A protein has these predicted regions:
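Low-complexity acidic/polar repeat-biased segments
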Residues: 1-39, 238-303
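N-terminal segments that cap or nucleate solenoid repeat domains
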Residues: 2-90
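Generic beta-strand structural signal
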Residues: 47, 84, 176, 267-268
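Short, surface-exposed beta-strand/loop "edge" segments at domain boundaries and coil↔beta transitions
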Residues: 49-51, 91, 190-192, 230-233, ...
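A generic structural signal for beta-strand entry/edge sites
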Residues: 51, 219, 269-273
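Generic structural detector for well-ordered beta-strands
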Residues: 53, 210, 223, 285-287
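Acidic, glycine-rich calcium-binding repeat modules characteristic of RTX/beta-roll
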Residues: 58-74, 79-83, 87-239
Length: 303
């Protein structure tokens, strides 16, 4: 899909770092910063704001397949910046607004209690925002992204990714590859007055997950849970009007720290509203495509 704004770069090139942030001198550590019970299997940082890179071979398995810290890293308190190695690693943000970068390997990253930024890097990664309004970037390879609670922004990046907003009003970008956007039946919202939107001051309120770069040519699909199939839903094409148009740009969310020059600008867009036929509840919105372009797949509730 074409970008609404020429001010943005391709979503696949965006990194979840503050613009101008210097991380060239970040310390590389191989020992926990807080002593812990070895039975916990956790590599602990501190209750403060830590900025660290994990040395290779610390969280990953040794040649015998044994890891000294099988439960991964826990950042504890503070607004942390944690960068992993090329190993497959598990890292948890816990409290604070954390940034966790997996780099290489098949990583598992959890945000924790606040508003976090998770960046998978290369490898088939699992990213889970948990609480707060999180930014999740899968980047290369085939990733699974879950927003958790809060209003999250999920970007798959290159590869065939699976994006699940979970609770909250989430924005989903698959980027390159054949992606699956999962709309959970148990998080659907009651039908508003105008099929997806209540009107306030001439603007439509977005109350459901919003898929912003669905691409049928690349093989994107909508995942349905709760035993629903394409026969159990209703597709309605509508035009909606919203403010802060940069938040809904098909090229992806604005990289953190950049000046948001398109905030407060109003835009109208054609969307397909997906509702459950039996209840009328809204499962989600898809920007810029007609109902005929959408393909659906049943998805397990045990995800």
């Amino acid at each position: 899909m074409q970008s609404i704004s020429s001010e943005t770069e391709s979503v696949s090139n965006q990194l979840p770092r503050q613009v101008g942030e210097d991380i060239s001198s970040i310390p590389v550590i191989s020992q926990p910063l807080t002593p812990g019970d070895m039975k916990s299997g956790l590599f602990l940082l501190t209750e403060n704001a830590d900025t660290v890179e994990i040395a290779p071979g610390v969280l990953g398995s040794n040649p015998l397949g044994i890891s000294k810290y099988p439960n991964g890293l826990a950042a504890l308190g503070g607004d942390d910046y944690v960068r992993g190695s090329t190993d497959p690693e598990a890292m948890k943000g816990n409290q604070g607004n954390d940034t966790i970068e997996g780099q290489g390997g098949n990583d598992t990253l959890w945000g924790g209690q606040d508003s976090d930024v998770l960046y998978g890097g290369t490898g088939d990664d699992l990213l889970s925002g948990n609480l707060g309004n999180d930014y999740l970037f899968g980047d290369a390879d085939n990733d699974l992204l879950r927003g958790g609670q809060g209003d999250d922004a999920l970007v798959g990046g290159a590869g065939n990714d699976t994006l699940i907003g979970d609770l909250g009003v989430d924005r989903l970008w698959g980027s390159e590859g054949a992606d699956v956007f999962v709309l959970r039946t148990d998080t659907a919202t009651p039908p508003p007055v105008d099929c997806g939107c209540g009107n306030v001051d001439g603007l439509d309120e977005i109350t459901s997950d919003f898929i912003l770069d669905y691409n049928s040519v690349q093989g994107d699909r909508i995942g349905l849970t709760g035993g629903l199939t394409a026969n159990d839903i209703v597709l309605t094409q509508k035009t909606i009007t919203y403010g802060d148009r940069r938040d809904y740009d098909s090229s992806g969310p604005l990289p953190l720290g950049q000046i948001r020059t398109l905030d407060f600008q109003i835009e109208s867009a054609s969307v397909t509203v997906i509702t459950e036929a039996k209840t009328g509840n809204v499962l989600g919105l898809v920007k810029g495509v007609s109902p005929a372009q959408l393909q659906f797949v049943s998805f397990s509730d045990s995800i």
